[in-house]
């Protein structure tokens, strides 16, 4: 069924197809149809960050930036749903076209630029949703906020989403907001994380609950840089790391149509690079902080490979675009079939 739907959707421009798919998934969720039409994955509960997940396969941020289809995605069988990236104020993102399919490589290039309707709108959608599972909210900074003032934007979003999120992801790794990735390193990273950790403890007291903080990092780092990031995350008291965002590299797609477009590359070509980051993080963290693996999962076995590399959970986005809900079931089954330690 999804194969036919994809053939029709892929005749449209990528962004039109994305918006239409979001509308359809959202409508199906409101009507309660998605769970009926889609075969559900096997139960595979797991506890991570003190949260109970129905299964370890989640929706990565970016597909539902404004929380428009939370119930719809949950009904497809995802073990958790992450929405955003959301910024304090609404912003249009980068000029179109800004989203490109590379079907020969099962890949996508995007330079969306955190287009979203703002944190207040997102929270309206969260409050309207019936979903009671694990909901992550991914936060970022506005395009016109100087990098030196980025912490202000993250704190605004943290304050607003805190009471509505199961966990909060701090996105410092999108390649489409100038200067953002510089926040992953050195004093910039430590100052940001320390500010977030301090405010989180205050919010925990006010709300009577401690909401986990996850940091999403890029795949375009050396082993040494990754090790330094891991050390800073532990020192600052973060609860998880998401590895990884899209890559600026173009290995394997250089000669394909749209392969030279600016933006972040996701899908199959980022699998090896992303999984390597997971392995490095796992060695550095030594089990002291869970890893949520994202990047390049287009087959169920890729999800199992991420878990074997040291991840506790996985997320999919580009693979879902190409494979549909079947990939969720396939990934859950592959993880369930792994030998127990």
From Swiss-Prot:
What are the entry keywords?
Cell membrane, Flavoprotein, FMN, Membrane, Oxidoreductase, Pyrimidine biosynthesis
Intracellular or extracellular location(s): Cell membrane
InterPro entries recorded? Aldolase_TIM, DHO_dehydrogenase, Dihydroorotate_DH_1_2, Dihydroorotate_DH_2, Dihydroorotate_DH_cat, Dihydroorotate_DH_CS
Q: Which GO terms describe its biological process?
A: 'de novo' pyrimidine nucleobase biosynthetic process; 'de novo' UMP biosynthetic process
**Molecular-function annotations in GO:** dihydroorotate dehydrogenase (quinone) activity
Q: In which pathway does it act?
A: Pyrimidine metabolism; UMP biosynthesis via de novo pathway; orotate from (S)-dihydroorotate (quinone route): step 1/1
Classify the protein's membrane topology as the record does: Peripheral membrane protein
Q: What is its main location?
A: membrane
Record keywords: Membrane included?
A: yes
Q: Which reaction does it catalyse?
A: (S)-dihydroorotate + a quinone = orotate + a quinol
UniProt entry tagged with the keyword Oxidoreductase: yes
**HAMAP family per the record?**
DHO_dh_type2
Q: What does this protein do?
A: Catalyzes the conversion of dihydroorotate to orotate with quinone as electron acceptor.
Q: What is this protein called?
A: Dihydroorotate dehydrogenase (quinone)
Q: What is the native source organism of this protein?
A: Pseudomonas putida (strain W619)
């Amino acid at each position: 069924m999804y194969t036919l739907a994809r053939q029709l959707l892929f005749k449209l421009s990528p962004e039109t197809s994305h918006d239409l798919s979001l509308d359809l998934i959202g409508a199906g969720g409101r009507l309660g149809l998605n769970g009926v039409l889609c075969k559900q994955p096997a139960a595979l509960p797991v506890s991570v960050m003190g949260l109970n997940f129905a299964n370890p396969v989640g929706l990565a941020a970016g597909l539902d930036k404004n929380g428009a289809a939370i119930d719809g995605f949950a009904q497809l069988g995802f073990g958790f749903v992450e929405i955003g990236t959301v910024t304090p104020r609404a912003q249009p993102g980068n000029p179109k076209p800004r989203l490109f399919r590379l079907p020969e490589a099962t890949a996508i290039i995007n330079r969306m630029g955190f287009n979203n309707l703002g944190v207040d709108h997102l929270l309206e959608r969260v409050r309207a949703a019936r979903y009671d599972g694990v909901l992550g909210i991914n936060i970022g900074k506005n395009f016109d906020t100087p990098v030196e003032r980025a912490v202000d934007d993250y704190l605004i979003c943290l304050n607003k989403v805190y009471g509505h999120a199961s966990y909060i992801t701090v996105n410092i790794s999108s390649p489409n907001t100038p200067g953002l990735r510089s926040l992953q390193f050195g004093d910039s990273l430590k100052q940001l994380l320390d500010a977030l950790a301090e405010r989180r403890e205050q919010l925990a007291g006010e709300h009577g609950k401690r909401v986990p903080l996850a940091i999403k990092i890029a795949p375009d780092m050396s082993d040494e840089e990754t090790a330094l990031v891991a050390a800073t995350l532990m020192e600052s008291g973060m609860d998880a790391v998401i590895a990884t965002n899209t890559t600026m590299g173009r290995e394997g797609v250089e000669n394909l149509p749209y392969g030279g477009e600016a933006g972040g590359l996701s899908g199959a070509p980022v699998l090896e690079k992303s999984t390597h980051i997971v392995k490095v993080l796992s060695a550095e963290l030594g089990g002291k902080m869970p890893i949520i693996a994202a990047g390049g999962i287009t087959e169920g076995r890729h999800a199992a490979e991420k878990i074997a590399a040291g991840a506790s959970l996985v997320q999919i986005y580009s693979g879902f675009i190409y494979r549909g809900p079947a990939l969720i079931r396939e990934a859950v089954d592959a993880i369930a079939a792994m030998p127990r330690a």
